[in-house]
């Protein structure tokens, strides 16, 4: 007698399971970032690496720990990766839309006298763009987007829908920096070094201001991720990388040897950052409306 095999549709994820996976995404990133920042300098000292090489060691640790871990838990296309062609188009879209928004708002701020551009060294600027892109991509953009706008986002969206996923992903994102400092401090103590700063915000920054900016940044990255139907995570990665680059040129140009010196003529100049993030988010929402007409479904 022939046996009949009835296929049952996969059961929907439980609320607890979805929240657990979402938190796991944040935990993976926090541990990877903490280990990279803590173990990177130790390995650099052992190998005698300095400068860019030392920074790349720390950055590579973060990516090597975070990205393969997530891809063992979920399929690459599920978290938002795609074919090489689609990935490149999505990445360039993220970079292009974000750069355009930043130029528009920062240009307006310059015209209003909020920013004064005093010095431009093209050779130094190009060098900064190359080195900053390599380090920021491995240290932050790729691993953070894979764990958070990738694994955390898809875990929450699949169970709760878009709006709760936006709030949940943003909340988890805001927990990562502080949690990572605990991991870094623990590794530093084991190595006999100064544990350094522990806190929810980088040393010298007001915690509330930092968390508000982080929340706006998260919403912009989610808008980028939701804007495209194919390889959408790469749009968020491109956006993340471009925001880090623009902010470092505008706010930390001299300290980071960017080749550009920017004077903030008014305390209100810092508001240009959240403003251009909002402009970029709106642009991605408009892009989403267009792509949804041509691409069925949504990642």
Residue ranges: model-predicted function:
Residues 23-27, 91-96, 130-143, 163-168, 201-217, 271-278, ...:
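Hydrophobic alpha-helical transmembrane segments
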Residues 170, 194-265:
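Functionally important transmembrane alpha-helices
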Residues 46-58, 160-172, 205, 231-235, ...:
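Membrane-interface starts of transmembrane alpha-helices
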Residues 5, 44-52, 76-146, 153-159, ...:
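Juxtamembrane helix-loop-helix connectors linking adjacent transmembrane helices
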Residues 143-170, 174-175, 226-231:
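Membrane-interface helix/loop boundary segments of multi-pass membrane proteins
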Residues 27-31, 95-108, 136-140, 165-179, ...:
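Alpha-helical transmembrane segments of multi-pass integral membrane proteins
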């Amino acid at each position: 007698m022939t046996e009949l095999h009835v296929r049952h549709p996969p059961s929907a994820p439980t609320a607890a399971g979805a929240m657990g996976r979402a938190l796991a995404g944040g935990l993976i990133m926090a541990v990877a970032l903490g280990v990279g920042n803590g173990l990177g300098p130790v390995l650099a000292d052992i190998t005698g690496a300095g400068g860019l090489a030392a920074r790349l060691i720390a950055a590579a640790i973060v990516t090597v720990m975070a990205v393969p871990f997530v891809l063992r838990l979920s399929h690459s296309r599920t978290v938002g990766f795609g074919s090489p062609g689609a990935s490149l188009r999505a990445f360039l879209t993220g970079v292009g839309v974000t750069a355009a928004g930043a130029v528009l708002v920062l240009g307006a701020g310059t015209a209003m006298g909020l920013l004064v551009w005093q010095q431009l060294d093209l050779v130094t600027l190009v060098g900064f763009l190359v080195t900053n892109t390599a380090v920021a991509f491995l240290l932050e953009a790729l691993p953070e987007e894979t764990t958070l706008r990738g694994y955390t986002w898809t875990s929450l969206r699949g169970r709760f829908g878009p709006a709760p996923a936006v709030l949940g992903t943003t909340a988890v994102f805001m927990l990562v920096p502080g949690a990572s400092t605990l991991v870094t401090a623990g590794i530093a103590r084991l190595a006999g070094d100064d544990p350094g700063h522990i806190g929810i915000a980088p040393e010298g920054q007001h915690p509330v201001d930092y968390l508000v900016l982080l929340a706006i940044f998260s919403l912009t990255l989610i808008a980028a991720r939701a804007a495209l139907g194919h390889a959408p995570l790469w749009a968020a990665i491109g956006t993340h990388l471009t925001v880090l680059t623009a902010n470092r040129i505008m706010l930390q140009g001299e300290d980071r040897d960017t080749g550009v010196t920017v004077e903030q003529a008014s305390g209100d100049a810092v508001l240009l950052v959240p403003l251009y993030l909002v402009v970029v988010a709106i642009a991605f929402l408009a892009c989403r409306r267009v792509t949804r007409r041509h691409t069925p479904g949504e990642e």
